[in-house]
Amino acid sequence: MPTGHEWRSSIEGGEFQPSRTRFSRGVVLTSSAVILLIATIILWPIYQFTTSSVSAGDPTPVATNQTEPTIIHPSPTATLTPAATASQALISPTMLPVSPAQVVSSPLQEGLVVLALYEAGHSHLFAYQSMATPYTRLTSGPWNDITPSLSPDGRWLAFASDRSGPWDLYLLDLHSGELTSLTDTPQFEAAPSWSPDGNLLAYESYDQNFEIIIRSVFDDQTLLNLSQHPAADYQPTWSPQGRQLVFVSNRSGEPEIWLADFDEYGDERFSNLSLNPEMQESNPVWSPDGTSLAWAALQERNHSLFIWHPDQGARYVGSGDWPIWDPDSSILLTALRDANQTLLTAYQASDSQLALPPVVLPGSITGLTWGRQPLPSPLPQSLQQIVSEIPELPWSSGSGENSDTQNGREPLAPLINVQAPYPQLHDSVDEAFQALRAKVAAETGWDFLSSLENAFVPLTEPLPPGMGDDWLYTGRAFTFDSLPMNAGWVVMVPEMYGHQTYWRVYIKARFQNGSQGQPMRHIPWNFNARYAGDPLFYEQGGEIGLGIPAGYWVDFTEIAASLGWQRLPALPTWQSAFFAARFNEFFLPNDQSWQEAMFDLYPAEALLTPTPVFPPTLTPTRTPSWPIISTPSP
């Protein structure tokens, strides 16, 4: 095996190899109807035989060259509650209804898929081998494990974790269960990718900027800082031939797919593969046979997957956000994000047919990988102990302790040490709020939710136009204080799903030494631009910011979702009315509709009565008077 110094010199030198009368009219019409009826009776058996023969012999055509992306719209009812997620050591997937004609086959019968799933406030690793078996837990604890990557031989699992404070790389031996630390630095390090021979790892490293680092796996040597560019370079993936590396970079001004060729030197080593300024690409991955690339792209409101071939360019495959290939390079498995849930689906790489119906995952995806070798059987003792562990939610969901059994309604619970116009929430969600508050405070280093713009809002307090049926009236929602935005401590990134706009909220970590949060990869929205005097920015409600904020940030939306709190879409008028953006509102429905939630607090009579709106005070006007002119008496 070549030494670290030999690998470094060979890479740097280009030698590395690894969609008339009434009566008459009545007679005529009646005769026509009789003729049509007789014709129908005679021809119907022939028609039925013909159509049955055609349908039996010809399959339903499937379009392979789509000119416009088709978005998979998941059912909003097919979800798992946080309580169900936390009560299972082996998490079972939830299938969405799909026509059998749409499914080609089940792709998850061979090999091993490892997912990083965010659950109950933390991200952990799970093995997913087929639809018949649930997820098998591989890691557990009060920390986060993300971006897993299986080695070519299937024995080793590299991933990033903050279990020791800063984000470092770790190596899990699936045969023995032994865990080894690969890096120990204050910098953020994640997204490892293996070289074909399994001796090297390429990964992203953040030190005020994202760079691609190549290091040896077994001799603890950092070989090369590949990119060394002022732009952000991240999410590397190694070519199966070993001579090329693909990564995401914003060198051209937006995230695009770039190629690093080890046979070239200087600026000739790097080239832009996607070349599409209208899209934001991410998560590239090589096919195991080395002939194609797949990546995700965001264009306007479409979340799409593309397969790129050097001789054919990029072609659209389907909807998705994070693709991986099966070991035979025939299936693309992908995570598909919706506003408040994540799904798992798959496509045939050759004709884009659906290979796996959408499966609702119990949490959001923070990484996934697919290898040819299954999990060892039996599992090593250390992994068997982890499989049996059950994470617990920091609160118990359900009815509150002070339910009004006399009328079937539940009271409001006070929020201790929280500033708000009405510091109360429904008795069934107040503990969930306090759990979210504590979790965010621990992750960010400051009590972000100690001050709220609104918690419960009584019916006597009218909200702005368009918010007559807002969740704030139910006591199951809150809006955080937007003042930290002015100090640059909170930023929002717009996310488009269908025709609706949602916001992802990031909070700046108090300690910027790498022990809290992660670096951002997206440019936030600048609401203040609407007041800069430019009519265009005013009409569109602001503009995209000038760049990615530096430092470490905590994804508030991610944490809230893992504890059951959902976000609301912006109102259609958000571009002209700041309050309509609703970026700061989160609610916990507990499987209830808005009307059902209102009946928990109010009798039906209260909801049938229109919400009182006080009439405006009449503007006082002076009573006109005519001047009295005295005339002399005769």
Task: Please annotate each region the language model reported.
Residues G445-G466, T573-A580:
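Acidic helix-start/capping segments at beta-turn-to-alpha-helix junctions
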Residues D470-M492:
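Mid-length scaffold segments of soluble, non-membrane domains
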Residues P2-F16, R22-G398:
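Sequence signature of WD/YWTD-type beta-propeller architectures
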Residues W370, L375-S451:
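Active-site acidic/histidine clusters and adjacent loop/turn architecture
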Residues F448-S451, A477-S482, R567-A570, E585:
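Structural recognition of the beta-strand scaffold that forms the well-ordered cores
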Residues P107, D469-G475, A560:
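Extracellular/periplasmic catalytic domains that process cell-envelope and extracellular macromolecules
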Residues L415-D427, P465-M467, F537-P549:
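Second-shell loop/turn segments in exported
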Residues I46-Q48, N486-P627, P634:
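Catalytic cores and adjacent binding grooves of peptidoglycan-active enzymes
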